Amino acid sequence: MSREQITSAKRIVIKIGSSSLTGKAGSALDASAVNKLVDVVAACKKRGAEVVVVSSGAIAAGLAPLGLTTRPKDLATQQAAASVGQGLLVAQYTQSFARHSITASQVLLTTEDVVRRSHYQNAQRTLYKLLQLGVVPIINENDSVGTQEIRFGDNDRLAAL
């Protein structure tokens, strides 16, 4: 896909990985990094594009508040970090988008939400309505209740949908 095709797209899905949101140590959100990413999204919206952000980072954002310095290996601690970090992540996005008078929303999905037709259709309707209202949906895998998703990186699959 050419740069011209990307800049003229009416709808853009941006996948943001944890390493793009955290400081050098990778264990805390970096507000300036989030602000820079949001500035790019805001520029896309300003030219008329609908933008969906698929963002990782909940586990990374939850590490420092829990006193953890590295990503935990066990599922329960990963889920605890995701639970703490998701609120921090969305709060940072909300604050960053507010600088541009843009409303952001949180959409947490699980595998069930994309494989069960009725769940998928409901999520799809919600996303379409958010875009219609001018909101930037911030989609993340619901890592606090997910199991295999944490290990297999389902945000990549979410972005592809």
Outline where the language-model segments fall.
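Nucleotide/pyrophosphate-binding catalytic subdomain
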Residues: 1-161
